[in-house]
Regions:
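Feature captures the catalytic ectodomains and active-site-proximal regions of enzymes
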Residues: 1-110
Length: 110
């Protein structure tokens, strides 16, 4: 069977609305240390897994509001070793735009 769960983190969005770069950095660091650091070992203990991480929308510090700008994403498959990349707003600008439904298809196709 397929297990699927969603984690929604609001802290980065709120920091964007506030225009607070330090809070946005702290929210991302907390995601890494408090959620991702425990999630990966837990997933590993259950067998093969895939993980799609992305924001639901952009909230640039400069505008302090939601925009339709492309967002970065990371799709990880535990069975595939490969080069890492940069997960950033500036990094996504050089990548081709992938519609959300295609990302979900890639996630579930594993």
């Amino acid at each position: 069977g397929l297990d699927l769960f969603v984690i929604h983190v609001e802290a980065t969005d709120e920091a964007g609305h506030a225009g607070n770069v330090a809070e946005k950095v702290r929210a991302l660091e907390n995601w890494d240390s408090r959620i991702l650091a425990g999630l990966i070992p837990a997933l590993d203990s259950m067998g093969p897994w895939r993980l799609l991480m992305l924001p639901d929308h952009a909230t640039p510090l400069t505008t302090r509001t939601h925009t339709a700008d492309p967002v970065p994403y990371v799709l990880v498959d535990s069975a595939v070793d490969g080069p890492g990349g940069v997960f950033s707003e500036s990094g996504v600008a050089a990548e081709p735009l992938v519609p959300g439904y295609q990302l979900v298809s890639r996630l579930l196709a594993g």
